[in-house]
């Protein structure tokens, strides 16, 4: 720029980089890009900043809708149920013969057809309760004990000793959490009331106090029982072990090459930074372009069977980010036709990338909109290849594209208007799309199950919680049972359990693994010898096992490094063995800071 701020002759000729001449180079970002960066700020600092940004009226409304109202409903249920039961019996007993039978049949029919949705609601409430009370209390106690004891033992502790310590701390944490819960029950019990009368419905406000006391007792009882159950189950099950050796590849049999990427965090701007890393991480999407370029060359040299991306395709689930991801993939049709994707927490649970303190109310269209963006992308990438599960028959149903065809107009209308009515109608559609199954090509081939492991959260700061719904797990197991000779990749975003490696900080150990991870591993146990779980989420390069189940954790080819530092991903080779799926030594693909060769 000249002295008056105009472009000089040399600048007009294209020889000057205006950004580099600016006082603040916009490509380098600024403090606003570090608002939620865990790489440059502590969780305490981020949490402190959130307090000044939170909308407290909105927080109060969210607290009422998500905690207080469910607690009152939960606590009032025994009172209202008693009233309803007595009144219903009185009326049924007054109806002669056939009338009584018809009423009972009607009640049974409503229960039968409403049961699947009711189970979803009950399960979501149960695991919401776990994520609010049981999981934080139990996991906090367990991980604090582990962190302290592993710190005392030091790095010389062997893997077998660490496994025993982790089993013992699980049992101890369950006992401590149960004792705290019993103390809460003792405090609330004098204010409880478990029977009601019809007259109580005329003055419902007088039920609030006993209902809240009932809720405290019920929640605490759940905490006591669940903590003990989790502690015993976690202590008794096989502990995670790091894999030191891999299976040999010389045996005859079918092999599959699977490129496993995760957490690519596509941004919608050429110089955009990521939420987690801020200025401590890379800008733009150059690393993704480099990874796809390398994959193209590797595929041309030796064909890949699958390109699996286990979540966090985008940084915040915005439309521009999905557009950038699909544009990059569209340029490489040979990769696109064998790519499989599943949702991560950044694809679904970031309410506002610029403001971590923002809340999504249960009535907000934002969450459903992010789900529909992800579903639309999954349909475009793999809809004609993967199939949904017919839960009533316990076997594979139509392809994802066929399943969504009757709902395309509703999805488009909701994306255009954000209508609450349309949003409610799309809730069950989203839930029933999982697990998505790429069936094995032969009876003894390799199938891929794509799960949604994201718990429903309404706050960016708690976006990372994970959960595999029991209905989804049962659907997966029924398909695996139906294809009795096949091998399986069970793909999800969240890590099943905390890694069996020492952590530098306590914050690294808490709140990001599956809430019900140990339960899910036990469900997979009958199929463990012919299944491999693949996930991402924490950007940790780790391969291990839990009993017979092999587990592969993918590093991020994008995160955990600046632009001038290398990253990597892996190509895994799987081989069919005698009744088992073998994992051969992986091939590491390094993404250099500037190279393209």
Language model regions located:
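N-terminal active-site segment of His-dependent metallophosphoesterases
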Residues: 17, 21-102, 112-169, 194-324
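Extended active-site neighborhood of metal-dependent phosphoesterases/phosphodiesterases
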Residues: 243-247, 324-475, 557-559, 563-564, ...
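A short C-terminal boundary segment appended to hydrolase-like catalytic domains
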Residues: 574-597
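Beta-strand-turn-beta hairpins that frame and shape the catalytic cleft
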Residues: 247-259, 266, 431-450, 484-487, ...
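Active-site environment of divalent metal-dependent phosphoester hydrolases
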Residues: 267-270, 315-317, 345-353, 456-459, ...
